[in-house]
Amino acid sequence: AETPTNPLTDLCDIAALAALAHAHGALLAVDNSFASPVLQRPAQLGADLVVYSGTKLLDGQGRVMAGAVCGSTALVDKVMGAFMRSAGLNLAPFNAWVVLKGLETLSLRVKAQSAAALELARWLEAHPKVARVYYPGLPSHAQHALAMRQQGGLGGSVIAFDVVGEGAEQLRANAFHVADSTRVCSITANLGDVKTTITHPASTSHGRLTEAQRQAAGIGQGLIRISVGLEHLDDLKADLSRGLDTLA
């Protein structure tokens, strides 16, 4: 299970999923990359394995490719042992050191980014050229109560929103216009960085799906995902306004 999900920030009730999985003799693995251990600790809610992309929040500055699988020694050896023996597991020492340095500021970064993301999400929700905002920290999010309970009262640093427009072609053009008009945000698929990133999921993370598959998943051509960094909030609002305010 991935919670929150990419890019629509849907949530899974980890405790409920763990109970369901264990009742049927199954294990539960949770991808906690979007929340980080600062907001959410799946193992304490019953998950058997917790996985992370260390490239994202754990590093926080997009410097390394890294990942982690966390669980009991016995379980990790059972599910990963053959792979580890065949392919190896350890990061290069320098990359491991970089991630360790990132962990030193993880709590400060995640809390600051979550606070900024909430304010930016509120601003986007009120913008006339934004059709819908997806952010667990907003009361309008369908799973807001679960987010507050499961994520320590914070919504995280990732926001998704739909721009206005009629038809797939115009929606895509409008989304590209907003992204291309930014100067502070970095157009990249990475997230969790101290630098705010912006991306168009329909042509990046979900680009290999058919249009019908994207629509079924709720990924429209007008959808934009933002990972909020540590820039001044006024700068981010001005950066996004440049494109949003000039949409037809």
Name each model feature, range by range.
Residues 84, 180-184, 241-245:
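Short, solvent-exposed amphipathic alpha-helical segments in soluble enzyme
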Residues 98-108, 156-168, 225-229:
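Short, well-ordered beta-strand elements within core beta-sheets of diverse protein domains
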